[in-house]
Design a protein with these regions (language model features):
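Noncatalytic, basic helical substrate-engagement surface that gates or grips nucleic-acid strands
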Residues: 2-149, 153-155
Length: 155
């Protein structure tokens, strides 16, 4: 029979060789997908919550299945990006985001805070840009695997 300290030593050695896992979230894309995929849930006060429900369900699933060491959410901010400077018609055909989704996007920051998830956003850049930058920076760290969670096909 192995001694408990011997087992712990082997377990620690195995964990040292194991890579850490970083999950990156495209917050806007995830919320947008949840908003359109789920019913129009609302709180007693009438506040829309369907996209937030979808977000929480997804976060719980990611945490349970992927067991990440780190999670980061990236947001788009309102306003033009450097892409608008390069191409004046960038996203020109897009419909205005519905107010009930905008409210949930704003409230999602509270959800991420409750989960202890760090948020990144930067004027002039989209979440995709930040995700790509984080991935490029993380590639330099050989001990971290990156998983991107997004509902956006161009991420």
């Amino acid at each position: 029979m192995k001694k408990p300290t011997e087992e712990k030593t082997k377990e620690k050695a195995a964990n040292k060789n194991q890579k850490k896992r970083l999950v990156l979230l495209d917050a806007h894309a995830i919320l947008h997908r949840a908003y359109h995929a789920l019913p129009d849930f609302s709180a007693r006060n009438g506040e829309p919550t369907g996209a937030l429900y979808g977000l929480v369900a997804m976060l719980l699933k990611i945490i349970e299945e992927l067991k990440p060491d780190y999670i980061t959410a990236c947001f788009d901010l309102a306003g033009p990006t450097y892409r608008h400077d390069a191409y004046e018609h960038y996203k020109a055909g897009r419909a205005k985001t519905e107010d009930s989704l905008v409210k949930q996007i704003d409230r999602s920051r509270d959800v991420f805070a409750a989960f202890g998830i760090r948020i990144y956003d930067h004027a002039g850049f989209e979440a995709d840009d930040m995700l790509g930058t984080i991935v490029e920076q993380t590639k330099k760290m050989k001990d971290i695997d990156v998983v991107i969670a997004s509902g956006d096909m161009d991420t």
